[in-house]
Amino acid sequence: MTKITLSPQNFRIQKQETTLLKEKSTEKNSLAKSILAVKNHFIELRSKLSERFISHKNTESSATHFHRGSASEGRAVLTNKVVKDFMLQTLNDIDIRGSASKDPAYASQTREAILSAVYSKNKDQCCNLLISKGINIAPFLQEIGEAAKNVGLPGTTKNDVFTPSGAGANPFITPLISSANSKYPRMFINQHQQASFKIYAEKIIMTEVAPLFNECAMPTPQQFQLILENIANKYIQYTP
C-alpha cells in the first residue's frame, strides 16, 4: 500500500487557505452585523421622526390656519375663508334650487326637511333646558307638535304628541361638512371651528332654499323659527 505524505510546503498552503476562509467568514459576519446595526438605526430614526411629525401635525392643526405650498409659489395660506368657499361651491354643485325647479316632489320634500330640521333643533334646545330645571316637557312637546302640524308638515301622533316624520338634522348640512372635512381635515380638529363651520353651513343652506318657500302655503324657515321660539319662551320664562 502506498502511503501519501504531504510535504511541509503543501501543508502550509492548505493552512493558509483555511485561515483565509476563516478570515473571510469573520469579515462577512462582521459586515452583516454592521448592516443590521445600520438598518436598525434607520428604523429607530424613522420612528422618532414619525413621532415628531405627528406631534407637529397635532400642534399645527390646533391653530386657526396653516401654511403650505412650494418654494416657487411662496407659502399658500389655508384659512376659514378657504374652507367656507369650498362649502359654498359644494352647495352650488348640489344645486337644490335647480333640482327643485325640475321636480315638484323634490321641492316639497326639501321644504319639509328644512322645516323639520328647524323643529328638531328648537325642540332639543328647549327640552334640554327644561329637563335640566326639572320641568315637565310634555306640554311643550304637545304645543310645538301642534305648531308643526299646522304649518303642513307630515308626521304621526303618539301619546297626544305630533312629531314630524322628517324630524332630525338638516339633511344638507352633512354633505357640506363631510366634503370640507375630507378635503381640509386639519381645519376640523378644533371643536370651536367645527361649530363655526356648521353654523355657516346652516346659514348658506337657508339662503339657498329661501326662494322655495315663496310660492307655497308653508312659512319660511325664519318664520317657523319665530313661531317655535315664542312657544319655547312661554315655558322657559318660568324656569328658576
From Swiss-Prot:
The lineage of its organism: Bacteria, Pseudomonadati, Pseudomonadota, Gammaproteobacteria, Enterobacterales. Coiled coil: none annotated. This is Guanine nucleotide exchange factor SopE. Activator for both CDC42 and RAC1 by directly engaging these Rho GTPases and acting as potent guanine nucleotide exchange factor (GEF). This activation results in actin cytoskeleton rearrangements and stimulates membrane ruffling, promoting bacterial entry into non-phagocytic cells. SUPFAM superfamilies: SopE-like GEF domain (SSF81832). InterPro entries: SopE, SopE-like_GEF_dom_sf, SopE_GEF_dom, SopE_N_dom. It is found in: Secreted. Keywords: GTPase activation, Guanine-nucleotide releasing factor, Secreted, Virulence. Gene3D superfamilies: SopE-like, GEF domain (1.10.4120.10). The keyword Secreted applies. Residues 78-240 are annotated as: GEF catalytic domain. GO terms for cellular component: extracellular region. It holds the Pfam family SopE_GEF. Belongs to the GEF (guanine exchange factor) SopE family. One of its GO terms (biological process) is actin cytoskeleton organization. One of its GO terms (molecular function) is GTPase activator activity. It comes from Salmonella paratyphi A (strain ATCC 9150 / SARB42). It comes from the Bacteria.
